[in-house]
Amino acid sequence: MVQRWIDWNTDTGSELVDIGTHKLHIACLGPPRKLGDPAVLIVPGLGSSITGWAAVRRQLAQVIRVYSYDRTGYGESDTGIEAPSSIMIAHELDLLLRKAQISPPLIVVAHSWGGILSREFLALRSGDVAGMVFVEANQEHTLDILDWRLLANSPVLTGVDRDKVHNIENLHKLNKEEWEIYQTTEASDKHQKQAALEYEQYPKSFPVLEAKSQLEQQPPILRSRPVCVIKGDNGRDFQKLFQAGIEKGNGSESERVAFEDVLTTWDVKDQALQRGNLKLSSRQKYFEVPFSGHNLQLTAPDAVVSGVKWVIENIE
């Protein structure tokens, strides 16, 4: 039996929760929650810790209870023995919520690969999800149509300082302490090792989700529960990286052409892919945040909060 020091419905704080095989770290912020009140659950992207969501959590906690957690191997959570597949991650999240006795309804906020992970969680607990916010999120056809890894691993980007090009250090909206914690956490050996394990599992997760045919279900799997999709500007990020690579003299002519060919149709394909997640519900909202890059939780937390507030307002 888990010894609980925190009442997850009324207290704020964080704790390690034993899910049987190991312990996961979970934190909660925001006003006390009565039975039946919705709460936000944040699912970060590939190789990402929850520390990058500090500004979003801080703002959301003014209006709603917010739960966030470190996946296996990240932050204060234990390392695990199982490969971090999308199925395993969703299973562990389900266990965590049950062990901590955190009840639905939940508004799931998912970023990047979190789009895949959150929908595996949806497959487990579709009745417990009151709404969803997809932030620059993947879906099952992402790698088939727009495999960003072809650009990320291109010789054109050899030696390019990606953080410097993205200028996140000057664009982020974290406070000084939050930024320092974020940098320290994500630079740690523990974090990097777990991120590498997730990268191995990443491509395997897409056909697994596709087999569930969630986007084809009628009526939609969430019926009229609200879904908001927020698109950033990842294509602009890659365009800036491309220019930096060219300035370094990187890549052969054919490699440069191949890179530019992907960028030419990036926005059209990216928009269609991200809009695809709207098929999960008949109640939908879509908007874009120009000049924000991929990591809106860092550069445009206000936009994420706006999407969550729309979901709150549209829960029946």
Q: Language-model segments: which ranges?
A:
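Conserved catalytic-core motifs of eukaryotic protein kinase domains, centered on the activation segment
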Residues: G52-A54, S77-A83, D144-L146
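Catalytic active-site module of serine/aspartate enzymes centered on a nucleophile-bearing elbow/loop
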Residues: A272, K279-E316
